[in-house]
């Protein structure tokens, strides 16, 4: 995302908890700040993308990044967090005269590299219109889904769907293998069937091979399903399939000694 902003000609100042992760951006022309506040204090637009709600609160509130933003600046958060946290950030921004969009992304590493991410946006239309040139450097679609919190709501729904699809294929694979049919035969049919999907086109071969390079880590998908279940409980919505999948992901996460892709949920049937 940062490299695409630089390619589009935007001046960029960055910070990362792990300095090595920022080195490609620095080599490409970005400036390195010593802390989040140092990024925010001169920014017209501040983009945050961190791993979980705790990290976002640490960056925005504990580090002082939010209070360092000047009046009239815009904060875009592309992390995946709860809608409630997005609304709390929006309220804190409003108190300081800062505009806010919750804009989590989908598209994975490939989409980020190609500049073809989809931003799921919650906030005001006029704010989205103003920052659209920045988003266009990183993505291809920016639907406005509603007020602040709507972007995070849709993102949690989408990731729940991805988690369920991969979990369902893992069960399918376990059944077919357990009944004595090679996985390769299943793949012949799967790839010509209506069961195909974008995520399974990528993840199913990984699951058959038992190789799980972390395009989207299991620990992050586990977090996102948990957030979806928490939102469902708050709203009185029953998610029986989501709850069952969460237990499966939880067991695999606790027993995995590496940091695998979420397609490693298939390990549940090999334990």
How would you label these PLM feature ranges?
Residues 1-48, 68, 72-73, 78-79, ...:
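NAD(P)+-binding Rossmann beta1-loop-alpha1 motif at the extreme N-terminus of oxidoreductases
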Residues 12, 32, 93, 99-101, ...:
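Hydrophobic beta-strand scaffold residues
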Residues 17-18, 52, 124:
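Residues in the short beta-alpha loop(s) of Rossmann-like NAD(P)-binding domains
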Residues 36-99:
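Rossmann-fold NAD(P) dinucleotide-binding segment
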Residues 61, 80-159:
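Rossmann-fold dinucleotide-binding core
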Residues 115-122, 143, 147-179, 188-202, ...:
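Active-site-proximal catalytic alpha-helix in oxidoreductases
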Residues 196-263, 269-271:
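Interdomain hinge/lid region at the active-site interface
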